[in-house]
Amino acid sequence: VDGFKLDRGEALVPLKSNCKAHDGRTCREMINAYPVEYIKATYEIARDMHGKDFALMARAGYTGSSRYGVFWGGDIRSYPEGLRSAIIALQRSAVMGYPFWGSDIGGYWNGELDREVCSRWLAFGCFCPIMEVGPTEDRGLWSMDTKPAYDPQLLATWRLYATLHNRLKDYTYQYAEEAHNSGMPIVRPLFLEYPGQKKAYDDWQTYMYGPDILVSAIWQKGKTSHTCYLPKGDRWVNAWNPNNIYKGGQTVTIETPSYKIPVFIRQDSDVKLGDLNQLYQESQKKKKKEPD
């Protein structure tokens, strides 16, 4: 066993009883401490077994728990509003000291999996430190509730963003080290990277992934175009069309079919994602029929 996914932890302390913990603290005193002790105990066991070569992914946390593992957002609904809440939670978690965070792509419960929502969530999940697909109740992106249950187009989108997320691993690791050493998170709301610009506080769907990649996540259904703010002081390369370079300090609108998330690269950076349109075309060529 190389790691654990630690579910629950935040609702296991009965507040209405007179119970006490082993050290004498009441359950009410333990309500926030319990999630920290939960992941800490698991961390210490795993460390004794594996040294530093293991991983813990927890759902519950409180001040101090981020030193022991990475986190995901728990049971999010499979609705557009669920994706919206994940976009907000990613950035809030980052500035609260949880730099390694992800969400259940597609949501976890309550309602049919929607193809467009799943496609948007895959795109967003690519630009999170943790990318995982999380539907339950025998549902998955390879077994949809509605016909066709096996959707080659959706799986091609998954392939596109899984490939891109893997390409980003060295970049992510670089700023994971920075987060560990300095506290500066991997994911940075625009106002954190560009504090002097008012529009950086207003555009909450747009954030920085590290200092050089700007992402503007989409949660609404039916959006065929999207407008986002590009901070002034830099020039920005459209990752979907590297020939399009924009001066910062303006809002831009680009076409956004369901598979496409606005991504811009700071021009003077060393980031090399390639042409995302070409990567998308390659993912389409690999579409397959449902296996026997």
What are these regions (language model features)?
Residues V1-D292:
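Catalytic-domain carbohydrate-binding cleft regions of carbohydrate-active enzymes
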